[in-house]
A protein has these predicted regions:
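Carbohydrate-associated surface elements
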Residues: 103
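N-terminal glycine/serine-rich phosphate-binding loop of ATP-dependent small-molecule kinases
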Residues: 1-96, 108, 112, 124
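Short, surface-exposed amphipathic charged segments that create phosphate/polyanion-binding patches used
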Residues: 113-117
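Active-site neighborhood for divalent-cation/phosphate handling
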Residues: 118, 123-132
Length: 132
């Protein structure tokens, strides 16, 4: 039975992978970098495959540093950055880079929608403010 918890945080510039014991003590951690793409002014995108690759590069080293066998992992928690959506094909393959929280290409659309629907109503419906 597993006795350790694995945390994976997909951040803006890197993923962080960490293993904790049941008392919350850090056993080992590591970081895997990836890039932000800026193809046009106001655009900020990332390739979800880069996220996956960074986790796959980082995880083995964290487990090795912690001296914990993967079968001893009881659970995995994953945190992602804001509300980025990933477009996948019918086989689960990434179709394109995804806009991330600092992408502002939808600014005009957000202004129009916010003018028609109260900001508090939008928040009540989806749990997030409408912003580019």
């Amino acid at each position: 039975m597993g006795t350790y918890l694995l945390g994976i945080d997909i951040g803006t510039s890197a993923c962080k992978v960490a293993v904790f014991d049941q008392k919350g003590r850090l056993m080992a951690s590591g970081t895997g970098d990836y890039r932000v793409y800026y193809p046009h002014p106001g655009w900020a995108e990332q390739d979800p495959q880069d996220w996956w690759n960074a986790v796959c590069r980082t995880l083995p080293g964290v487990l090795e540093k912690s001296h914990i066998h993967p079968r001893k992992i009881a659970g995995i928690g994953i945190a992602g950055q804001s509300w980025s959506a990933v477009a996948l094909d019918h086989e689960g393959q990434v179709l394109c880079r995804t806009p991330i929280w600092m992408d502002t290409r939808a600014s005009e659309i957000c202004r129009e929608v916010n003018a028609k629907i109260r900001a508090d109503r939008i928040f009540d419906l989806c749990g997030n403010p409408l912003q580019p």
